[in-house]
Amino acid sequence: MFQYWLQSLKKVTQKIMNNLKKKYLEEVSEKLKEEFAVKNHMAIPRVRKVVINIGLADAKDNAGILEKMSGNLGALAGQKPVVTKAKQSIAAFKLTAGQSIGLMVTLRGEKMYSFLEKLFNIVLPKVRDFRGVSDKSFDKSGNYNLGLREQIIFPEIDYKNIDKPRGLQITINTTAKNEEEGKRLLELMGMPFVKGAING
């Protein structure tokens, strides 16, 4: 039953994704071109990729945690994640270089649009007492960093397949030249910023 529901969700998400991509190409890009006086079409700000990271410090002592969370992340991202490993040994944390310490997935193209639309319209509104995300999490290059406290707010996650709530970090990498362009790009694409935060 769950698998049937998941397949149905993927079909709906695919349709939504096509709408977001279409919206960017037909509406968002044109508004950005006009507002920022962009002459070269290739210079119009766009989302380049979305990177999702989950830190699993306890995975070094329990391989089952890594396997279970790999399934969770793969389900919510729509793509198989890669394992991140410690680059150096840290005695204080009993960490050895090469040990598995997390998972990461990088989304581009169709899967990227699919994930963003789901994030903006389905996932974030499910956060308790949600009033919008901060517009203060951009870097100087217009990339946005978002931290979520738990993976269970994603519709693909089955409660039976989680050992405990785990946070994840989402980075939306853009081609924007600065913070202002990055903010406007995501606002037009539907990022639910705190009301009145943009240009306020």
Where are these regions (language model features)?
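Ribosome-associated RNA-binding proteins
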Residues: T13-G200
